[in-house]
């Protein structure tokens, strides 16, 4: 991406998903130490399992490394067994939270309306939501990818985010763990469509909202992807589990 005086710093977000026991904290410490030695051009965040969030936040406190939750509930409290509220994420030391990740939408049937509720709750708790959108292979092959994703953006972002910090992550489901790769042209086309919708919804603020790419970003492809127009960072999955790989992506900027 090309930075200007009004463009926020890029964001490289490492989503550990359902991976990581206590020993994984050593990987986070290694990332933090490397970023202290050489401050990054981007903001960097790790999203560990909820069981590690508090300990990881303490382990990297004061470093150039943010932490966040992989999900939050739309309610602040109540009879929601197994769920975590946005306030709990913040209380554990997180400053960001992922809302509507493709695996949450697929595995748990989360709708865009529910995602919007999560994003609203996150912002109200002082967290920065990363709202995820993306299409399946079937939708893309039907020629409906752009219209589908734009609709997701529209329905997943509550108007209450106006004036609040948030970002959008584009996850092409067909390029995650399938062996398929989204071309830079695919990425640029979709990010441009998302940008247009953001400007339509949020006016000038929509011009500076970061749009992250989240389709199997790895050290080998990070530089090309991060240099593409309208790509404001990356939502990284498996490659964020090892400090060496994650740092290579961070340093690609």
Curated annotation (Swiss-Prot):
User: What GO cellular component is one of the record's annotations?
Assistant: cytosol
Q: Which GO terms describe its biological process?
A: gluconeogenesis; glyceraldehyde-3-phosphate biosynthetic process; glycerol catabolic process; glycolytic process
Q: In which pathway does it act?
A: Carbohydrate biosynthesis; gluconeogenesis; Carbohydrate degradation; glycolysis; D-glyceraldehyde 3-phosphate from glycerone phosphate: step 1/1
An MF annotation (GO) of this entry = triose-phosphate isomerase activity
Q: Which residues form a coiled coil?
A: none
Outline what the protein does: Involved in the gluconeogenesis. Catalyzes stereospecifically the conversion of dihydroxyacetone phosphate (DHAP) to D-glyceraldehyde-3-phosphate (G3P).
Subunit composition and interactions: Homodimer.
What this protein is called in its record is Triosephosphate isomerase
Organism in which the protein naturally occurs: Caulobacter vibrioides (strain ATCC 19089 / CIP 103742 / CB 15)
Name of the gene encoding the protein in the UniProt record: tpiA
